């Protein structure tokens, strides 16, 4: 699977097209564009999408921003589809402030990815 970088950011941002699903059920929501963020520990999904899935609640957590600020958040479990792959039971944080999906290392470390900056494409090597 190949996806072109999003040029709405400068410099262009690596992104992937994903689907979301209730754990162990079909990937029913999507496709959505998700930011590939290799510096993020975890994956963040807008709370509205999590509520539409009625995703199972896992725990209340605290997150630290890149500026060192702490925020309270809620963690849920969802399945995430990338290309023909289904990544089951991924713990994600529900974001009440943004409509962006951020794929962190808890997802990215399960994929074989090529970030081809000169060509401005993200490739999932299956």
Predicted features, each with a name:
Residues 1-126:
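Pepsin/retropepsin-fold aspartyl endopeptidases
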């Amino acid at each position: 699977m190949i996806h072109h970088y999003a040029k709405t950011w400068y410099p262009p941002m690596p992104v992937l097209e994903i689907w979301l699903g209730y754990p162990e059920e079909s990937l029913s929501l999507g496709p959505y564009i998700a930011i590939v963020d290799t510096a993020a520990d975890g994956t963040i999904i807008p709370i509205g999408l999590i509520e539409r899935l009625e995703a199972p609640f896992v725990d209340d957590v605290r997150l630290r921003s890149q500026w060192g600020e702490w925020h309270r958040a809620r963690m849920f479990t969802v399945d995430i589809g990338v290309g023909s792959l289904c990544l089951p039971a991924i713990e994600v944080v529900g974001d009440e402030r943004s409509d962006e999906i951020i794929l962190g290392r808890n997802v990215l470390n399960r994929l074989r990815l090529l970030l081809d900056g000169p060509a401005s494409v993200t490739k999932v090597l299956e």
